[in-house]
C-alpha cells in the first residue's frame, strides 16, 4: 500500500481492534527506504501467535537520520492509514526516535523501542501519560561501519521520557547485539543472537497491553 507521503505500508493481520505500527532504522547516507529485516522476522514470528493484533510495517521514502522529518511524516501517515482503535508503535534503532515523535497521534497508547536511538534533542513530551518499553541488547554498541546504539544511550532517553511523564520498563537482553535479523544477499533472513528472546519479550508486552484496559497503564 502506498501512503499519502509516498512511503509504503504492509499489514499482516486484522486492525479492527489492535495494531502495532513498526518503523525501521536508518543511516547517515540518504538512501531509499527498505523493509526492516528485524521487524519482518519479528512479524513473521508473532503474527500467528497474536491473531487479534494487526502488524503494520512502514517502509520510509528515505531511511536517513538526516531526513528525520521525512521519516516522521511517513510514520504519521501510516498511523492515520491504520487508524485502529488501539495502537502501539514499535521502533527499531532510528525507528525508536520516529515512533516517539509520532506517539502523540490519536489512538497511540505507547511505544516499544528495540535498541532505540533517542537523541538528546528529541522531544519526548509526546509520551506523557503513555508507555515506553525498551528492549536492548547488552552487546550493542557503535562499531566501524555498523551504526549500533549503546544501552547507555537508550537508557538516558528512557529516563528522560520517564521524567516527562511516561510509564515504562527497561530490559537488557544478555548476549544480544544490535537487531534481531539481517537480510542475506539472496533475500532470506538470518537471525542474530537471542532472536527468540527478543520475540518472547515483545510478545509478552503485546499480550500485557491488549489485556490492559485503555488508560489503565
Residue ranges and their predicted role:
Residues 2-52:
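Short, surface-exposed "cap/lid" segments of acyl-processing enzymes
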Residues 29-34, 53-70, 182:
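Cap/lid segment of the alpha/beta-hydrolase catalytic domain
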Residues 34-45, 141-168:
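Active-site-adjacent alpha-helix of alpha/beta-hydrolase-fold enzymes
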Residues 64-83, 198:
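Alpha/beta-hydrolase active-site loop
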Residues 90-99:
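Gly/Ala-rich beta-loop-alpha elbow adjacent to hydrolase catalytic centers
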Residues 107-118:
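A conserved short beta-strand
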Residues 128, 133-140:
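Short beta-strand/loop motif that positions the catalytic acidic residue
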Residues 162-217:
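C-terminal catalytic histidine-bearing segment of alpha/beta-hydrolase fold enzymes
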